[in-house]
From Swiss-Prot:
HAMAP family: NusB. This is Transcription antitermination protein NusB. GO terms for biological process: DNA-templated transcription termination; transcription antitermination. It comes from the Bacteria. It comes from Acaryochloris marina (strain MBIC 11017). PANTHER family: ANTITERMINATION NUSB DOMAIN-CONTAINING PROTEIN, N UTILIZATION SUBSTANCE PROTEIN B-RELATED.
């Protein structure tokens, strides 16, 4: 895992808790928000483990049903296929849990925490300007109508490009990767398209 990717994920989970106005936040307030984000991730991992356990049990039950209840080869095959799909989903959820100890270790590094706070601060202090850039770059959409997670992904990327001197392509790629994890199925494509329009806009002097 890359430390800055961890910082971006923590920032994404944190900025949803910030007030929408640009009132000054004390550093200790930002720290509290970030701690809440870590706790949110802990809860997600616990839920993933519980869900994976349930899916494995359902998969096992379907295999047993295929042996005892299937009336023909076709129905047996369908039950086994469902069991395989459930097992794959469970394995993917377990993958998240396996990565979590490394995530927490990195999240406790000062450099990760510092960059998380830089990101949160940039979005909070420049919220109005960032939102104006995004409104101009959206086609047939309004920012307030987007899913909160998508709007915040876009805000983070713009903050990195405009205020934190992160190369445009890096900011876009990282936002797309987070969208694959947190956004809807096609969300990452939408995020990519909007941010490419943003880069053209902010390149104009």
């Amino acid at each position: 895992m890359q430390p800055r990717r961890i910082a971006r994920e923590l920032a994404l989970l944190s900025i949803g808790q910030l007030p929408s106005n640009s009132d000054r936040l004390a550093n200790q307030d930002l720290q509290a928000v970030m701690i809440t984000a870590v706790r949110t991730l802990v809860a997600e991992v616990q839920e993933a483990l519980e869900t994976a356990s349930a899916e494995l049990k359902r998969g096992s039950d379907r295999i047993l049903d295929s042996e005892l209840k299937a009336i023909d080869v076709q129905s047996s095959r369908a039950m086994v296929t469902e069991a395989i799909d459930l097992t794959k989903t469970a394995v993917n959820r377990l993958g998240l849990a396996i990565d979590f100890p490394e995530f927490i270790q990195l999240a406790n590094q000062q450099s990760v925490r510092d960059y998380t706070l830089d990101l949160i601060g940039a979005v909070h202090h420049h919220r109005d300007e960032i939102d104006q850039i995004l409104e101009t770059s959206l086609v047939d959409w309004q920012l307030h109508r987007l899913a909160h997670i998508d709007a915040n992904l876009l805000r983070l990327a713009v903050a990195e490009m405009k205020y934190l001197d992160i190369p445009n392509q890096v900011a876009i790629n990282e936002s797309v990767e987070l969208a694959k994890k947190y956004s809807a199925e096609e969300g990452h494509r939408f995020i990519n398209g909007v941010l490419r329009r943003v880069t053209r806009q902010i390149a104009v002097p």
